[in-house]
């Protein structure tokens, strides 16, 4: 009887401890990364002060894809509403756009909805087209743009009136980016198309080599200081003069290691621009920092990621394809620290910075991590399928069942 009691007690202890260890850093092994990039002997992580932002106009916040250190002031749910059809293999949910306390959402069946951020009141909704799957939303100069996975591009005003529509009849997997009077579109056939926001007329385009096999979604372009940086599924990243379309530089985001299924040349992480530097992350175990104007290499590291990294203060935070969460000195590419965070049933889907804490999402939970040393802080049960967005202190999430929640 005593043996049975001890056995039952051990089982209880194991169950009680399992949740704490679910996202614990893996210990007892040396990362390939650690052997290739020396950990800094001196120096520490510094992140920018968290800020309340009042709008979110692009899939990754702005046209530089540089997400802020978001400020959230409360954690209690205010309201929750379903905005359309749930996600499945063929349906995607676009990252919401938030403008003037209104949330714009695009569901997997290409239905566009405008909702009051504070009350959850449905302002209007539009069925854009039948038999279309929504991909992305973007906003500029009082105009909203929706893109389907088969190249249907539609422009609306803030009242939901359709301004124009163009059907490119080509597969698209990269979110569209809108900047003032210009739209940037990337197709799966590796065409980069530049359009006027007024009427959708084409300004110029570029065609690179034949497409590679797509294992994930493609990354959007980024623009700053007259240069637009475009990632292609071939592993090429090209810098163009934004006005003329003149090719300025080319970088291949492919490392030195032999390719396997985890090292395809496709680029899923968006370019991130800060100042005169663009940070590029490939899927094929290769990332680096480059001159925005010339493409000159500043530093490279032999690991990759499928998630857009976070740049804040003196640090670039990245989750590698091997689940290595790493904090890099943005000037040298050397590491302040590295931790390996495992997941159970779902891969990590996003990385963000909220209230000066790194936040990883696997679709069902949010894992909060200390940016100074990479240690786990806590886990919250929050389901989401897009980036968490914080506007005026409110956290906004969309889950796989197409439920929009504001905290």
What is each stretch, according to the model?
Residues 116-120, 157-161, 196-200, 242-245, ...:
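Short loop/turn segments that connect beta-strands within beta-propeller blades
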Residues 27-36, 43-78:
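Blade/loop signatures of beta-propeller domains
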Residues 113, 154, 193, 238, ...:
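WD40 beta-propeller blade core
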Residues 18-21:
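Bacterial signal peptide processing site
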Residues 107-108, 148-149, 187-188, 232-233, ...:
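Structural signature of WD-repeat beta-propellers
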């Amino acid at each position: 009887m005593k043996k049975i009691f001890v056995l039952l007690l051990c089982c209880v202890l194991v169950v009680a401890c399992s949740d704490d260890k679910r996202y614990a850093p893996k210990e007892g092994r040396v990362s390939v990364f650690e052997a290739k990039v020396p950990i800094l002997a001196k120096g520490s992580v510094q992140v920018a002060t968290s800020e309340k932002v009042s709008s979110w106009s692009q899939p990754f916040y702005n046209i530089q894809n540089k997400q802020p250190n978001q400020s959230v002031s409360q954690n209690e749910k205010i309201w929750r509403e379903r905005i359309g059809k749930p996600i499945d293999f063929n349906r995607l949910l676009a990252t919401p756009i938030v403008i003037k306390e209104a949330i714009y959402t695009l569901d997997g069946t290409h239905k566009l909805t405008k909702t009051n951020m504070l009350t959850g009141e449905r302002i209007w909704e539009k069925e854009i087209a039948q038999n279309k799957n929504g991909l992305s939303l973007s906003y500029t100069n009082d105009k909203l743009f929706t893109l389907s996975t088969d190249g249907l591009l539609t422009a609306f005003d803030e009242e939901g009136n359709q301004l124009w529509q163009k059907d490119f009849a080509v597969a698209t997997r990269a979110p569209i980016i809108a900047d003032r009077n210009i739209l940037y579109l990337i197709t799966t056939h590796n065409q980069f198309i530049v359009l006027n926001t007024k009427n959708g007329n084409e300004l110029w385009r570029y065609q690179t080599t034949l497409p590679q096999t797509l294992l994930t979604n493609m990354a959007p372009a980024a623009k700053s200081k007259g240069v637009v940086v475009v990632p292609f599924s071939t592993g090429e990243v090209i810098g163009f003069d934004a006005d003329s379309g003149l090719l300025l530089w080319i970088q291949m985001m492919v490392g030195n290691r032999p390719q396997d299924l985890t090292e395809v040349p496709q680029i899923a992480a968006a370019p991130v621009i800060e100042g005169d530097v663009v940070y590029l992350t490939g899927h094929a175990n290769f990332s680096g920092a480059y001159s925005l104007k010339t493409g000159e290499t500043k530093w490279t590291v032999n690991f990759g990621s499928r998630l857009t990294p976070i740049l804040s203060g003196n640090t670039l935070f990245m989750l590698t394809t091997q689940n290595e969460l790493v904090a890099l000195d943005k000037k040298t590419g050397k590491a302040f620290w590295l931790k390996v965070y495992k997941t159970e049933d779902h891969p990590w889907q996003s990385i963000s910075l909220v209230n000066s804490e790194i936040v990883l999402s696997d679709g069902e939970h949010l894992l909060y991590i200390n940016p100074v040393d990479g240690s786990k802080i806590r886990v919250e049960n929050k389901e989401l399928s897009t980036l968490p967005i914080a506007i005026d202190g409110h956290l906004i999430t969309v889950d796989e069942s197409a439920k929009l929640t504001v905290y």
